[in-house]
């Protein structure tokens, strides 16, 4: 069982939760970079003891979309929690890490409030991607080096091309509503799934 650190963080603030599964303490550095057109980010550093779970608050960030990078001296498990407060309700979402996507990636966006497709680029060169919906014109994006960007989308299926090495995710945001999921490439041993009609 993992021990919980004594530091409590308000659920209203964005937070990185980190678990150190090994036997060595982790030197953690967290970077938050605003997506294109949003506020600038910040960086944070903390030591997390082996076998512990700790929360690192992402304070001093303005409202907006951010790409969060966690660097550690030893292997860790990490995710980002954000929250929204609406007129009548509040909600929170976990943004989990994911492996880089491939050059041709299929994404299914379910119905939900304010869906948005996000891209993060850890490389030192800008990357141009094309997002092709099932019908209608494609969306072209330039993802800056060591930064990120995103685009508003609708529910449906999209094919992303040119995004090899990028990390992608989908978020939903409405009045007192939020959710998110990572876009993951197919596994090396994945096989087609046959779906039979009723």
Outline where the language-model segments fall.
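Conserved functional hotspot residues at active sites or interaction interfaces
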Residues: 1-22, 76-125, 132, 150-152, ...
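Extracytoplasmic/luminal low-complexity segments enriched in Pro/Gly and acidic/polar residues
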Residues: 7-85, 116-118
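Ser/Thr- (and often Asn-) enriched beta-sheet segments in non-cytosolic proteins
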Residues: 17, 27-29, 45-47, 128-130, ...
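Short, aromatic- and glycine-rich surface loops/edge beta-strands on solvent-exposed regions
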Residues: 65-74, 155-172
């Amino acid at each position: 069982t993992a021990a919980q650190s004594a530091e409590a963080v308000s659920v209203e603030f964005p937070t990185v939760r980190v678990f150190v599964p090994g036997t060595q303490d982790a030197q953690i550095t967290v970077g938050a970079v605003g997506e294109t057109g949003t506020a600038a980010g910040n960086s944070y550093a903390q030591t997390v003891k082996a076998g512990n779970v700790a929360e690192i608050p992402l304070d001093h960030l303005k409202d907006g979309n951010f790409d969060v990078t966690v660097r550690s001296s030893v292997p860790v498990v990490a995710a980002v929690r954000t929250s929204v407060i609406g007129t009548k309700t509040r909600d929170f979402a976990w943004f989990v890490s994911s492996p880089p996507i491939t050059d041709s990636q299929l994404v299914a966006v379910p119905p939900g409030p304010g869906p948005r497709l996000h891209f993060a680029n850890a490389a030192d060169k800008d990357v141009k991607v094309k997002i092709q919906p099932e019908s209608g014109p494609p969306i072209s994006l330039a993802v800056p080096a060591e930064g990120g960007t995103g685009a508003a989308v609708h529910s449906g299926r999209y094919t992303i091309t040119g995004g090899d090495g990028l990390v992608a995710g989908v978020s939903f945001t409405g009045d007192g509503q939020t959710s998110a999921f990572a876009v993951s490439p197919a596994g090396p041993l994945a096989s087609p799934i046959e779906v039979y009609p009723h």
